[in-house]
Amino acid sequence: MNKEILAVVEAVSNEKSLPREKIFEALECALAIATKKKYDQEIDVRVKINRKNGNFETFRRWLVVNQVLQPTKEITLEAAKFEDVTVKVNDYIEDKMISVTFDRITTQTAKQVIVQKVREAERAMIVEQFRKYFGKILTGIVKKINRESITLDLGNNAEALILKEDMLPRENFRLGDRVRGVLYAIYPESRGAQLFVTRSKPEMLIELFKIEVPEIGEEIIEIKSAARDPGSRAKIAVKSNDKRVDAVGACVGMRGARVQAVSSELCGERIDIVLWDKNSAQFIINSMAPAEVSSIVLDEDRHTIDIAVDSNNLAQAIGRNGQNVRLASQLSGWEINVMTVDDLKLKHQEEKDKILNIFTKYLKIDQKISNILIDEGFSSIEELVYIPFNELLNINSITQELAYSIRESAKKALCAIELENKKVINERKLHKDLLNLKGMNQKLAFKLAKKNIFSLEDLAEQGIDDLIDIENLNSNTAGMLIMAARNICWFGNKTSA
């Protein structure tokens, strides 16, 4: 029997390309489980196989604890010290026992455990083997095709899955096709597929350019960001770390060879190569190519930007189904609003009129002074309260007396606004759960209360269009707050609170 154990270990190790130690551990576990099944009581067993001659010994063991909860598997520290004075809590006390004899049931149990343990070891080895390829392009042969995914054979018993959402639209594969994709997820504990590959994520575009453009690997050119509408269009932002190298030209290649190679791999996806710029405004203008931008207005606080284009360029700037502006927004990380030059002027005039009315109402100043403050960049009462006084004095046409008057009026106005907000709350109290919502603050809650939104239930019923007119609230934040409220109210997800 001992020689048979060594023969089994050698055979399985060679067949599965697994270390002999892993097979020995699987056998020890299998023999321990088979031994436990011989007893009516639940006991703990350890089996030790001699790696040289195949002999094995079996030990019953007890865990050393302060308080015994399972008498058949645990022993108190005081009792354990009679066996070994050096023993500590969480150590084991062991007694040698009779090793199991290999009858039919024992053999069947051992076989099942060994198969399971070997499979687990194989999966662990595959995960370890491919961990270094995370985020890199893998090539595999199509092994299996179904509606929701395809399975790639990566060799050495390793397989990867490409889900439907990770494929390109209208992409068709046949058995035996060679397919490339980026490894983006590894699940070590998964019972099903462990390796997941994508062809639709921006990482695929980035990795293809790294292959086609040697300057990227040499770090002469740096890829800053990428955005994709998979299979249709993409934008990638690049920057040169060497003034002598044209980043865009290097990525395009001679007669467009490099970008064409990437496009061909992605089923003809049209790719715009954009020059990255540390100036956000210039980068966004570059991102909007091929549309020509007439003027832009950035809102740093809300991280939004209004872009004006000529009316005859509006369709091109927006793109089919908003594709161009959506990709530019993803590429730059800014929320971009595209409109005609006239619409932008009208929008900003409306915003200016709104601020003008607030200033004239609360600060008791004429329109001329209000316009001066607006032209200097002031857009709220709070800014006039907390700005250093010297900055007010430095504004043309603002005397010291007028500056004091504006500051005092602003302080009184701020108090009046707070009282007005408290009145709104007292008339119909704001719910605590709304105030505690992630991303919510008291100032925003007051503004919601003015729109008769006093609870999470009220907020969950709103749409983004209902909230977008609130000052300093962009569509992304509005959408995030609404979804958080819905998750709590409709789906009972308290983690959004």
From Swiss-Prot:
The keyword Cell membrane belongs to this UniProt entry's keyword annotation: no
GO cellular component: cytosol
Region of interest (2 X 51 AA approximate repeats), residue spans: 364-489
InterPro entries: DNA_repair_Rad51/TF_NusA_a-hlx, KH_dom, KH_dom-like_a/b, KH_dom_NusA-like, KH_sf_prok-type, NA-bd_OB-fold, NusA_bac, NusA_N_sf
Alphabetized GO MF terms: DNA-binding transcription factor activity; nucleotide binding; RNA binding
GO biological process: DNA-templated transcription termination; transcription antitermination
Transmembrane segments: none
Domain KH: 302-372
Keyword RNA-binding attached: yes
Sequence repeat boundaries on the chain: 364-414, 439-489
UniProt cross-references to PROSITE patterns, sorted A to Z: KH_TYPE_1, S1
Record-linked Pfam families: HHH_5, KH_5, NusA_N
PANTHER family: TRANSCRIPTION TERMINATION FACTOR NUSA, TRANSCRIPTION TERMINATION_ANTITERMINATION PROTEIN NUSA
Family affiliation: Belongs to the NusA family.
NCBIfam families listed in its UniProt record: NusA, nusA_Cterm_rpt
HAMAP family the record matches: NusA_B (MF_00945_B)
Functional note: Participates in both transcription termination and antitermination.
Self-association and partners: Monomer. Binds directly to the core enzyme of the DNA-dependent RNA polymerase and to nascent RNA.
Protein name: Transcription termination/antitermination protein NusA
Organism placement in taxonomy: Bacteria, Pseudomonadati, Pseudomonadota, Gammaproteobacteria, Enterobacterales
